[in-house]
């Protein structure tokens, strides 16, 4: 059972490394001048899939740890403790990478919102109200006032 726990920790490490690759690909995409929304959606789906698998693997690790009678950081088992240390270090790295990607995404959203606001403000048709004054309409189509 100790070997199965080691294999589970190895699998978690592999899954975290996969997530690292996905986050780096996401970062490259977010650093590009314009975002390929289809590619971003694909990356998000990949990330969600691996995170779900990681959640299942962690549940298995917790069950095995209880069955063996040891828990993280596995100080009584040097090899397991080393694997756990690698997992903790990689998780911290992924946390920072994910936060950075979140900031990049937020910048894109802000820029797109500002652009949309500018376009709506400056490129909407001008209509005249009953008082003869110009009114801007941000709605598409015709506006009729009676």
Swiss-Prot record:
Q: Which Pfam families match?
A: FlgN
Location in the cell reads:
Cytoplasm
- NAD: is it a keyword of this entry? no
Give the matching InterPro entries.
FlgN-like (IPR007809), FlgN-like_sf (IPR036679)
Q: Which GO terms describe its cellular component?
A: cytoplasm
Gene Ontology biological process:
bacterial-type flagellum assembly
Which UniProt keywords are given for this protein, alphabetically ordered? Bacterial flagellum biogenesis, Cytoplasm
Major place of localization? cytoplasm
Main function = Required for the efficient initiation of filament assembly.
Give the record's family classification: Belongs to the FlgN family.
Q: What is this protein called?
A: Flagella synthesis protein FlgN
Query: What gene does the UniProt entry assign to this protein?
Result: flgN
